[in-house]
């Protein structure tokens, strides 16, 4: 049985969250009555209101109104007054992933999983399906620039979703195609150990039906090892690895644009497809790898080479993924969500490949627990930056951990031999420092999952105000 239209008013607690807002939007577009609440005003809240969805600011029992179903994310605590009221009324309480799973039952579904790269890969798969006239429905974990939103309601038979592994609920998603970009030791607070993370991703792939398939990155050692453990399911591999079924090679850079070739081998038939000089309007091998995953999916869905070329060459990217916020005196300022050492390293490497000048990295560590568990990895992920500025940790509600802070990380990076790493005590100091060290041709890359995105947006105008020069 699929979810009926007659389920009544659906109330989302925390509707402004990036995952919740997309589900709410698609439910609304399907004709369901939707409302919600969030702690504060935000761009997502305003976007939902503009679509006719009522959103309350603040959490109060009376916000439920006539709601017959309540949707919550794992970020919502059991003591939340709306959740308490819903349970007192014996209303069904649905987890975010469970509601996403219900939506997926209406379509053939592609779920994008992995520790990093999910949002960009989801966007790329959506772009290729759209270019192939498949008109997909999309629910993403980030704002897709082409849509101005993280959700899209299509009329086609395919749905593309980002599968969040952080709390294990991605195993509830009924995917026909499961993509795994990489597997790193993240979210150990939920899983307990890395072996449990590995087991979850194996189940994620093996959950696809026999007529479905997995798409797995052969460049990542953990994923390559997992490929050998997958039982009784079809797997398509991709990457730069010469053994990959969908392999990219001959990579060239033109500014912030990537050009590359792809060769696709069908194992059963031995048939080979070659795509020469594909263009992606963003730098970095990690982005080419994500594009390769999308190509693997598109090829299996019989999307033409012409459509694949068009979808990649016109790909508009994702908000906060190496997003240019402005230019000052020949210096380009970028905003990026990267907050894990693997992500930071990949972004800075991509910047290095496309920048003619120096790389100035500004990072706001996110969560004391992450900095503590990955301290040495953080100390070694900034090698492609000529200068590093580290701000205080964005706690995200966590308590401090003794000896784990940005000043300690500055000392560790400096002791490892980096020539220019500094502590940024306040964002008020940022423009002044950048104005003295940045030269024409340099990239300033601001990285983090906290409020550093606001600094990135403001920095070009702040630099202009200091110097009176801009472009």
UniProtKB/Swiss-Prot annotation:
Q: Which GO terms describe its molecular function?
A: ATP binding; UDP-N-acetylmuramate-L-alanine ligase activity
Name where it mostly resides: cytoplasm
Q: In which pathway does it act?
A: Cell wall biogenesis; peptidoglycan biosynthesis
* Source domain of life: Bacteria
Q: Which reaction does it catalyse?
A: UDP-N-acetyl-alpha-D-muramate + L-alanine + ATP = UDP-N-acetyl-alpha-D-muramoyl-L-alanine + ADP + phosphate + H(+)
Name the GO cellular-component terms.
cytoplasm
Q: Where in the cell is it found?
A: Cytoplasm
Keywords from the named record: ATP-binding, Cell cycle, Cell division, Cell shape, Cell wall biogenesis/degradation, Cytoplasm, Ligase, Nucleotide-binding, Peptidoglycan synthesis
Q: Which GO terms describe its biological process?
A: cell division; cell wall organization; peptidoglycan biosynthetic process; regulation of cell shape
Q: What InterPro entries does the record tag this protein with?
A: Mur-like_cat_sf (IPR036565), Mur_ligase_C (IPR004101), Mur_ligase_C_dom_sf (IPR036615), Mur_ligase_cen (IPR013221), Mur_ligase_N (IPR000713), MurCDEF_pg_biosynth (IPR050061), UDP-N-AcMur_Ala_ligase_MurC (IPR005758)
Positions annotated to bind ATP: 114-120
SUPFAM superfamilies documented for this protein: MurCD N-terminal domain, MurD-like peptide ligases, catalytic domain, MurD-like peptide ligases, peptide-binding domain
Enzyme Commission number(s) from the entry: 6.3.2.8
Family classification = Belongs to the MurCDEF family.
The record's listing under PANTHER family reads: UDP-N-ACETYLMURAMATE--L-ALANINE LIGASE (PTHR43445:SF3), UDP-N-ACETYLMURAMATE--L-ALANINE LIGASE-RELATED (PTHR43445)
Known role: Cell wall formation.
Please report the name of this protein according to its UniProt entry: UDP-N-acetylmuramate--L-alanine ligase
Give the encoding gene's name. Answer: murC
């Amino acid at each position: 049985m699929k979810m009926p239209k007659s389920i009544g008013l659906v109330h989302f607690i925390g509707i402004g969250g990036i995952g919740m807002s997309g589900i709410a939007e698609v439910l609304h577009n399907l004709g369901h009555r939707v409302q919600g609440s969030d702690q504060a005003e935000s761009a997502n809240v305003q976007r939902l209101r503009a679509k006719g969805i009522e959103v309350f600011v603040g959490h109060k029992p009376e916000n439920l109104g006539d709601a017959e179903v309540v949707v919550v994310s794992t970020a919502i605590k059991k003591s939340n007054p709306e959740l308490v009221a819903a349970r007192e009324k014996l209303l069904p309480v649905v987890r975010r992933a469970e509601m996403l799973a219900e939506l997926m039952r209406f379509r053939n579904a592609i779920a994008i999983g992995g520790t990093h790269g999910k949002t960009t890969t989801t966007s790329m798969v959506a772009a290729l399906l759209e270019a192939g006239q498949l008109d997909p429905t999309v629910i993403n974990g980030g704002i897709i620039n082409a849509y101005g939103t993280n959700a899209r309601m299509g009329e086609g038979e395919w749905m593309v979703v980002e599968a969040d592994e952080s709390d294990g609920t991605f195993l509830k998603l009924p995917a026909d195609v499961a993509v795994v970009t990489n597997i790193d030791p993240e979210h150990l607070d939920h899983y307990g150990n890395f072996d449990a993370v590995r087991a979850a991703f194996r189940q994620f792939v093996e959950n696809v039906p026999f007529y479905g398939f997995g798409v797995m990155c052969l460049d990542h050692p953990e994923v390559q090892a997992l490929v050998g453990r997958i039982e009784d399911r079809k797997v398509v591999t991709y990457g730069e690895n010469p053994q990959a079924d969908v392999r990219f090679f001959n990579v060239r850079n033109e500014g912030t644009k990537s050009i590359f070739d792809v060769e696709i081998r069908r194992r059963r038939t031995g048939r080979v497809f070659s795509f020469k000089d594909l263009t992606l309007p963003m730098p970095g091998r990690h982005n080419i790898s994500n594009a390769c995953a999308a190509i693997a999916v598109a090829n299996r869905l019989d999307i033409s080479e012409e459509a694949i070329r068009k979808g990649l060459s016109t790909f508009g990217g994702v908000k906060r993924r190496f997003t240019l916020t402005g230019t000052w005196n020949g210096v380009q300022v970028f905003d990026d969500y990267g907050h894990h050492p693997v992500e930071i390293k990949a972004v800075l490497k991509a910047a290095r490949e496309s920048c003619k000048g120096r790389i100035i990295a500004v990072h706001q560590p996110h969560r004391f627990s992450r900095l503590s568990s990955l301290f040495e990895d953080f100390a070694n992920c900034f090698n492609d930056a000529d200068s590093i500025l580290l701000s205080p940790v964005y706690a995200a509600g966590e308590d401090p951990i003794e000896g784990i802070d940005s000043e300690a990380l500055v000392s560790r990076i400096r002791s490892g031999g980096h020539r220019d790493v500094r502590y940024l005590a306040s964002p008020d100091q940022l423009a002044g420092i950048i104005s003295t060290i940045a030269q024409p041709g340099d990239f300033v890359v601001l990285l983090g999952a906290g409020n550093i995105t606001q600094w990135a947006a403001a920095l070009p105008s702040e630099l202009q105000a200091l110097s009176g020069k801009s472009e």
